[in-house]
Amino acid sequence: LAAQLGLIQRSTRVSIDQPAILVFAADHGVVAEGISAFPQDVTWQMVENFLGNGAAINVFARQNGCALHVVDAGVNHDFGPRPQLLHRKVANGTRNFALEPAMTAQECATALDHGMVLARDLPATVVGFGEMGIGNTTSADALMHKLTGQPGGRWVGARGGSALLPRPARPVPKGRRLT
């Protein structure tokens, strides 16, 4: 890790000043396919938990001297102003990619731009990234399928609560026909 930081910082004297963690939160429309044992409302409830310093990431950040910033990138909930919350909502979640494209090209570009600007503008030399959103594992699997052409399901392990599901949901194959 030290060698990687040195290469990134182009220095043999690695500096870890004001480390920060950005947790991006958003809802995923593919949840409508029954892929999660948990309701979509858990996304905004977890954001509230982060903001109330009640989650594991809060403990990790505190114990490691990291500033924690929660980013509303597309939660289907309206949050009031909070010191730790950065409002960068692109939409109230994505659409169901098993039925239609999850995002428009413009929505995707805007979301990526928000992330780049946030990472660039933080007064930190080291930034950690996290994510929260019911359905995020299935969405990540679909992205990896599109990026690599490899079969869906090979990139992710068991989803949170998947043992509670009555049947395995398979939205990634359905979504393959979409461009």
Q: What are these model-derived regions, one by one?
A:
Residues 1-179:
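N-terminal loops that bind phosphate or other acidic moieties
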